[in-house]
Amino acid sequence: MRIKITKHFLLTGLILAVLQACKPVDFTNASVQKIADLQGVPKQGYQGMAIYNDYLVSLQNTGQATIYQLSDDGLQKLHQFPLASLMPENHANVAFFGTERYKKTDEFPLFYVSQCSKQRYNGLKDVCFVERISLTEAPKLVQTIILDDTEGLFGYALQWMIDYTHNYLIGYGNTIENMGKGNRWRTMIFPMPKLSDGAVVHLQPKDAIDNYCIQDLDPRFPSNHIGQGACVIKDQMFIPVGLGTEAHPSILYIWNLKKKCLDHILNFQQQVPHEFEDCDPSHGDLIMQTNGGGAIRFKPSKK
């Protein structure tokens, strides 16, 4: 009898642990605190950002990068360098770390950067640069991912992000332009390209696992707003928007990729009257890079 009871409690505990791991994090009443000011290069706006363990990589327009040590109460600047993809056509709007390493001994996984600019790169748009970065060595461009958008499915601001849970590469962005008449926001999901796929990878719309416009599924998501970065946590896509102004407030939309609906619309304009940029999770919190307000920590409410 004791053995059966022990097994029962172990099984119950395991089920509860699995359910807790699958439960979305609630940022509805999140506490908001500034971590620190950013120390990038002058005269270039802050854009993409990615976190690996306790390293935060902050990007600026054209592809300037700064690596910080992230702690509960601050940022320690470790290294500043231009990406291998540094160029006027690289807005470097979104960044994320992948799951592969260029070499097994590399300190960081591969680093992905969304070009996301009205200016085309070698005549191309919708480009994702894949780089090998380091604290000590020069960065190296090891792969370029391109969506062959012959149908005009996206405007100029296609942002790439990774769904770690399912190993998907997700493209998200406007169909015309942020404030354009008739604009919508499209999401396309692809299997994650591998480094072994080659130096240049062309994605075709026909190969997408899913392809839809958010407004077709949930009209609460506005067609016109100032889009910023994005990231995926479990089955949710976190979409920061706005300029931190009354006309374009700092809002965080949380899109459920599984249910295909908005889970939350969170207005943080009062707490963060600055332009949201890119975001990434860190130890259960959400870290947001801003223009003018430094790095911000959103700590979920405890129930």
Q: What is each residue range found by the language model?
A:
Residues D37-P42, P82-M87, I146-L153, L217-S223, ...:
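Surface loop/turn motifs at the tips and blade-to-blade linkers of beta-strand repeat domains
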Residues G63-Q69, Q119-R132, E177-P191, E246-I254, ...:
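Structural motif
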Residues L70-G74, R132-K140, T187-L203, L257-C261, ...:
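Short loop/turn segments immediately following beta-strands, especially the blade-tip
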Residues C213-W255:
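Loop/turn-rich, solvent-exposed surfaces of beta-rich toroidal or solenoidal domains
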Residues C261-S282:
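Conserved blade-ending motifs and adjacent loop-strand segments that build the rim/top face
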